[in-house]
Amino acid sequence: MPVMAPTASLLLSPRPLPASRRVPSLPALSASGRLRLRRARADTRLRVAAPPSVPGEADQAPGETEPSTSSADEKFVWRDHWYPVSLVEDLDPSVPTPFQLLNRDLVIWKDPKSGEWVALDDRCPHRLAPLSEGRIDETGCLQCSYHGWSFDGSGACTRIPQAAPEGPEAKAVRSPKACAIKFPTLVSQGLLFVWPDENGWEKATATKPPMLPKEFEDPAFSTVTIQRDLYYGYDTLMENVSDPSHIEFAHHKVTGRRDRARPLPFKMESSGAWGYSGSNSGNPRISATFVAPCYALNKIEIDTKLPIFGDQKWVIWICSFNIPMAPGKTRSIVCSARNFFQFSMPGKAWWQLVPRWYEHWTSNLVYDGDMIVLQGQEKIFLSASKESSADINQQYTKITFTPTQADRFVLAFRAWLRKFGNSQPDWFGNPSQEVLPSTVLSKREMLDRYEQHTLKCSSCKGAYNAFQTLQKVFMGATVAFCATAGIPADVQFRLLLAAAALVSAAVAYAFYTLQKNFVFVDYVHAEID
């Protein structure tokens, strides 16, 4: 079986979660590999960033809790959970970062005074300009770029440049109306989590987010993480990651092969408002768990025999967070681990035999393999929903034909969304009239790696900029060699300069060609033999 890259395709679980425990919600891992992960996990305390006025922290050791069975009339409260918004290593602490969560605009920034990541409502209380367009000022506060109002890590206003130094205007800076709305945040395992209810500090402090399995700390496992913003809905992505059977076809010659398709007799083991779990038997064995609202775990165990090493048990973990940003827009954060085909080395990221950005090339191929298929599927679902004036989840089994056990997890997710999730996330605002991206974006826009991933990935953005610089360096060298090739009287020296010009031109072109992997790669299934 091929090496599994972090993908929005396949997800599996450590073991079926017992039906007597309630699952919490906690962040995922940092991406450069197990070394950084172990450092991130060294501090096992989960600390919630201080609330707007009174500091609060949850000093609880991270761990799993088991789900409880749920009655059919129990409803899932979307806003009472931790949501990961980014891998911490892909956030730039020197600038504010915009993010959407449940259709609410947030600004993420790092308070240099406390060292904490802060999430505020992305609107200045003055005239509602987006704070994400601002900057971190000289005092370490977030400054609005429109009129210069500044806010500290608690959301309190610290400066109004237009206010008179005395009198009523001087008091405005201390007014509650001048404060920005702050949300609970938590960092663990290299992920930044946000609690989307500004009034939920007490509940957030008492709630733990779901953990990655212990194998992510094991030196015997090699790990990779990636995040990418996808222009289709949360339900479309969750259906996709709940479906192992599509791997062999949608990701042919990437992480699967068409000739390996076979029956997948999955069986459900537990379900409720918390999510569900299930598995199959045989080789490979796939275990899957969905922990609502957005955490999916898949574990693949493969018994194999190698000529030199003998019997081996290969284990692959693919843990996915599928974050509902807005209707028709979802962030996928995937953490994968494997105990075979390891290419990581002790030391820093630049020292790795296979750098993170190169791993992301394969991972993005997986995303691309799903992208246009899911765009078309979502369009058809939306059309069917409009024709019948009924929600897709209410009529899913009527408009689809799912006769095999391979679709068990897909049906389980759709059933969960219908029974407990009110058929869609609890969006802020009134998004029903918004045009969904999948209905209007072109193929080129849907497969835009630069906007969806490179700009949001520290590794790929750095490599892309480096490739551009190296391309220019070798182009300059080509010009220099060409300009001087005719000067020497020695023919051999002229030939040497001409050869150097050809080599540098070829290297410059190679760097130019490689840059497409950070920007756009067309994906045509029919052209893959």
From Swiss-Prot:
Keyword Oxidoreductase (UniProt): yes
Q: Summarize induction of expression.
A: Induced by wounding and senescence in leaves.
**In the UniProt record, which is one GO cellular component term?**
chloroplast
Cofactor annotation remark: Binds 1 [2Fe-2S] cluster per subunit.
Biological process GO terms, please?
Answer: chlorophyll catabolic process; defense response to bacterium; flower development; fruit development
* Ranges where the Rieske domain occurs: 82-194
The record's InterPro entries line, in alphabetical order, gives:
Cholesterol_7-desaturase, PaO, Rieske_2Fe-2S, Rieske_2Fe-2S_sf
User: So, what pathway does this thing act in?
Assistant: Porphyrin-containing compound metabolism; chlorophyll degradation
Its predominant location is plastid
Instruction: List GO molecular-function terms, semicolon-separated.
Output: 2 iron, 2 sulfur cluster binding; chlorophyllide a oxygenase activity; metal ion binding; pheophorbide a oxygenase activity
What are the names of the required cofactors?
[2Fe-2S] cluster
| Organelle transit peptide residues | 1-47
Q: What is its EC number?
A: 1.14.15.17
> Binding residues for [2Fe-2S] cluster, per the UniProt record?
C124, H126, C144, H147
As for subcellular location, the record says:
Plastid, Chloroplast
Q: Where is this region: Disordered?
A: 1-24, 46-72
Tissue distribution: Expressed in leaves. Expressed at low levels in roots, stems, panicles and seeds.
What are the UniProt keywords, alphabetically?
2Fe-2S, Chlorophyll catabolism, Chloroplast, Iron, Iron-sulfur, Metal-binding, Oxidoreductase, Plastid, Transit peptide
Which catalytic reaction applies to this protein? pheophorbide a + 2 reduced [2Fe-2S]-[ferredoxin] + O2 + 2 H(+) = red chlorophyll catabolite + 2 oxidized [2Fe-2S]-[ferredoxin]
Further facts: Plants silencing PAO die shortly after regeneration.
> Could you tell me what this protein is called?
Pheophorbide a oxygenase, chloroplastic
